[in-house]
């Protein structure tokens, strides 16, 4: 007689009251984070006169493209500046990750005799800073890099905190036995780093890379100090100049009527400001969901211990 099998359905795990409360507060927090972004998008397409009289609102009565058109009027220069910003972001992030990961790998090796001295050298800029004036004198007077795109990449290429995160990840998340096995097989330090360590660092490289890319994308101070050519202006510097030109027009009482007519009968101030914000944060918002899991995993695994 065959034995009868009794299938027991697994009980569904019920969510406790605490999980519902946590979900409610997380949803509320998400709403608070998304609300300013939504308001910015709406305000960019709201009539500027309504913004000045009624203030910012989620439900405007009059819509207008004047603010966005005022920014997009710099179409050719806007495209050039977008290209400069993308180039600086991609190249700077790639070079920075390569240099910092090699630096972090060296500091994580117990047999490396100079690691303590280099660790102190790494911490000095974090504790003592020479200031912007000394950096300006060195870059322009010693290295003669005035109006060079290298000055958009080098000053923020390597940071102490990112090196510490990468070093901690190597020490705590990559088994030492893998590197010992590679050395037994005859692999040198370069081969061990590029073929074993670097591929295993993908989560934290993605996290640090996203933070670096965001820093490069939002940087305008270095361009403001060092860049003079319009063909080398990044996006943020161009948008600042657009905003200043609008403020200059608003403060000038002798504006030709042809200029006002070309801008739709009035000079948009707040709607143009919101339009510049959209142009800046748009690519970052689009890119973040693709890096979110690496961002969280890389930071939690690489920086909790150590």
Where do the PLM segments sit?
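A hydrophobic, multi-pass inner-membrane permease signature
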Residues: 2-306
């Amino acid at each position: 007689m065959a034995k009868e099998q009794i299938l027991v359905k697994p009980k569904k795990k019920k969510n406790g009251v605490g999980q519902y409360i946590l979900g409610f507060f997380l949803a509320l927090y998400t709403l608070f984070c998304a609300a300013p972004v939504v308001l910015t998008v709406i305000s960019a397409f709201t009539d500027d006169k309504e913004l000045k009289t009624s203030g910012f609102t989620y439900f405007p009565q009059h819509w207008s493209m004047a603010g966005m058109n005022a920014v997009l009027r710099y179409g050719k220069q806007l495209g050039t500046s977008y290209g400069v910003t993308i180039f600086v972001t991609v190249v700077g992030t790639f070079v920075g990750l390569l240099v910092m990961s090699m630096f972090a790998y060296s500091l994580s090796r117990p047999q490396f005799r100079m690691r303590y001295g280099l660790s102190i050298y790494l911490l000095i800029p974090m504790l003592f800073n020479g200031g912007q004036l000394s950096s300006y004198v060195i870059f322009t007077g010693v290295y003669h890099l005035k109006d060079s795109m290298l000055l958009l990449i080098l000053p923020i290429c390597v940071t102490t905190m990112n090196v510490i995160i990468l070093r901690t990840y190597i020490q705590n998340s990559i088994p030492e036995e893998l590197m010992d096995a590679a050395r037994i097989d005859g692999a040198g330090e370069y081969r061990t780093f590029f073929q074993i360590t670097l591929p295993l660092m993908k989560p934290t490289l993605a996290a640090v890379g996203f933070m670096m890319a965001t820093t490069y994308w939002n940087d305008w101070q270095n361009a403001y100090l060092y860049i003079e050519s319009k063909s080398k202006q990044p996006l943020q510097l161009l948008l600042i100049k657009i905003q200043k030109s609008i403020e200059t027009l608003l403060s000038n009482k002798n504006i030709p009527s042809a200029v006002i007519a070309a801008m739709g009968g009035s000079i948009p101030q707040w709607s143009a400001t919101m339009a510049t914000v959209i142009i800046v944060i748009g690519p970052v918002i689009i890119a973040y969901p693709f890096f979110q899991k690496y961002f969280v995993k890389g930071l939690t695994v690489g920086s909790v211990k150590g």
